[in-house]
Amino acid sequence: MERIKELRDLMSQSRTREILTKTTVDHMAIIKKYTSGRQEKNPALRMKWMMAMKYPITADKRIMEMIPKRNEQGQTLWSNTNDAGSDRVMVSPLAVTWWNRNGPTTSTVHYPKVYKTYFEKVERLKHGTFGPVHFRNQVKIRRRVDINPGHADLSAKEAQDVIMEVVFPNEVGARILTSESQLTITKEKKEELQDCKIAPLMVAYMLERELVRKTRFLPVAGGTSSVYIEVLHLTQGTCWEQMYTPGGEVRNDDVDQSLIIAARNIVRRATVSADPLASLLEMCHSTQIGGIRMVDILRQNPTEEQAVDICKAAMGLRISSSFSFGGFTFKRTSGSSVEREEEVLTGNLQTLKIRVHEGYEEFTMVGRRATAILRKATRRLIQLIVSGRDEQSIAEAIIVAMVFSQEDCMIKAVRGDLNFVNRANQRLNPMHQLLRHFQKDAKVLFQNWGIEPIDNVMGMIGILPDMTPSTEMSLRGIRVSKMGVDEYSSTERVVVSIDRFLRVRDQRGNVLLSPEEVSETQGTEKLTITYSSSMMWEINGPESVLVNTYQWIIRNWETVKIQWSQDPTMLYNKMEFEPFQSLIPKAARGQYSGFVRTLFQQMRDVLGTFDTVQIIKLLPFAAAPPEQSRMQFSSLTVNVRGSGMRILVRGNSPVFNYNKATKRLTVLGKDAGALTEDPDEGTAGVESAVLRGFLILGKEDKRYGPALSINELSNLAKGEKANVLIGQGDVVLVMKRKRDSSILTDSQTATKRIRMAIN
């Protein structure tokens, strides 16, 4: 009170007022504080002070022609004084109001295109559904998440080239647009942004948002796809969560999801083939996801998932240095170990050869539903701190950690024999044998582990062998925590090697990934996955195998028919016929194959008995190793639609139906394509097969009389020449060979020579 009174007295004296308003502020420290550097020291004050002035805003001089001096109310809009230090004029805030109401309008057509990501976000939020708020402890763990929905997956460099090309096409500088996505996006954006008046820099920023994946390392409990991350601040706090369903999906999330499904399917299929690595590469290169080549997506997409990483490793791309075991991602945070082979006895006295890691190590374990910190020594678990969504998830993490520790009591807890096999019927390695065993039933493991009394530590509780929580006792070395363990944040990628059985190792030889680690979870892909490889035909069931096999023969008929006559064994061994074998009853495979191969040989030997449709129909049956038997068949059985269906050796059936009039083939009622040539037995389509034993001399020569039909050829004597009508009404001159030994080469040269003779 005293101070205020004193100030009042001072202010009543005119001298005080004069000192405060008229004298300069000349204390150097104060001047320095407020004038050094470009950074505004007190923005709020500055703003208030500026706006209190009559003309706080500067504008380009041209504004004087475009805006009246006074508005309708007679208030002055701009002053004649120039802005100090620039050639701009000072204007009133009222000028802005006038401009907004009466200024020139411009086309808004480009706004939704440039600010596409914002417009789409508004739509998603408009159609999203917010549910109730729940108050509960949130176990958040930091994960690397995509914060920018609706982007393409270009690298920063690729995006930079696209942006320069779209926004500043006339700037100098080498720009190389190589990838398909770069070219497509550039073309599309150039068309969209023709005559765009929005500031180029703004357009460039917005394009960057659309083209590049931006990731942040954020604490998340719940969904990690970008449409959930964009509302993270609305859906989870420290002690609450709000249910939310996004009002739309974005392509980048769909690509990530579909990529994982495609990769899992491919790895699973490759595992059971003769050469897994070669098959995997063949499938990755021939698969498309949402119309984009899978290999292009793999090169650009940073998704880290076991199957995806195996595919990347096979392509020679770098992957994360963490390793996977039991569906958890392990990252060593300290310590080191050396590997040594050791033989151990299970509780069933079965001998296992395990590679023991000797030394003290610490790991973080991160799974979909649980995370943990693990400290271990040689074959001993020292401490495991787990957190998870529920009892089940916590139990999964504990089992994986117990097996990983390689402790003796874990190995002794095995009851019964370990004989788990993978999809290719090969025995799993010992560590995965143990894992599968305890994942099936961990009762004995938990009972034998041992328990210990625990201290009361904030945020930690014990867990008993029956997986119930306790504050007094806990499984030895194991505690449950309320806090999650963060995912490994580094985006560092390392060079890895992969062997033909798809085991991925780092440069020190540690196994990071193997097909055993690939999840068996089946999902439905959001984008269409097109597997062109014959190895994936069976993914849609037996019918698809049947249709695809016949489609393949028809598509490749030109080369197939030449091989059929010249190198049948190579044709029979083609991998495209592999899936078909699973449709033929096991007992019949060898017999069918022997029968069909004999039939084909007769066709090759007897002129004019060639039958295109029959060859196409029976070819897949010749692929199995043949059994020599005298058996004849009038129909062959295939297992589709849950039962055996018959394919007639001569004639049509519901399974294989060739329509002579339309020249189209239908397999199980589905169109399998058209035969481009006339499969009429008389003038057989495969000239090369028919003209064995004849040498093609060239174009028609009238001196040798009228053209004979193929059937009349057999009457020629050795060395005799004749004109022959072949295929599509073309005539060529042939000579019957003097020796039979050279017959094999005929069909090879025949095909080439017919073409030359006709053309």
UniProtKB/Swiss-Prot annotation:
The record marks 627 as: Avian adaptation. The keyword tRNA-binding does not apply. One of its GO terms (molecular function) is RNA-directed RNA polymerase activity. Its main location: virion. InterPro entries: Flu_PB2_2nd (IPR049110), Flu_PB2_6th (IPR049114), Flu_PB2_C (IPR049115), Flu_PB2_CAP-bd (IPR048298), Flu_PB2_middle (IPR049111), Flu_PB2_N (IPR049106), INV_PB2 (IPR001591), PB2_helical (IPR049113). A motif (Nuclear localization signal) lies at residues 736-739. Keywords: Cap snatching, Eukaryotic host gene expression shutoff by virus, Eukaryotic host transcription shutoff by virus, Host gene expression shutoff by virus, Host nucleus, Host-virus interaction, Inhibition of host RNA polymerase II by virus, mRNA capping, mRNA processing, Viral transcription, Virion. Pfam families: Flu_PB2_1st, Flu_PB2_2nd, Flu_PB2_3rd, Flu_PB2_4th, Flu_PB2_5th, Flu_PB2_6th, Flu_PB2_7th. It is found in: Virion; Host nucleus. One of its GO terms (biological process) is symbiont-mediated suppression of host mRNA transcription via inhibition of RNA polymerase II activity. One of its GO terms (cellular component) is virion component. Plays an essential role in transcription initiation and cap-stealing mechanism, in which cellular capped pre-mRNAs are used to generate primers for viral transcription. Recognizes and binds the 7-methylguanosine-containing cap of the target pre-RNA which is subsequently cleaved after 10-13 nucleotides by the viral protein PA. Plays a role in the initiation of the viral genome replication and modulates the activity of the ribonucleoprotein (RNP) complex. Belongs to the influenza viruses PB2 family. Influenza RNA polymerase is composed of three subunits: PB1, PB2 and PA. Interacts (via N-terminus) with PB1 (via C-terminus). Interacts with nucleoprotein NP (via N-terminus). This is Polymerase basic protein 2. It comes from Influenza A virus (strain A/Seal/Massachusetts/133/1982 H4N5). The gene is PB2.
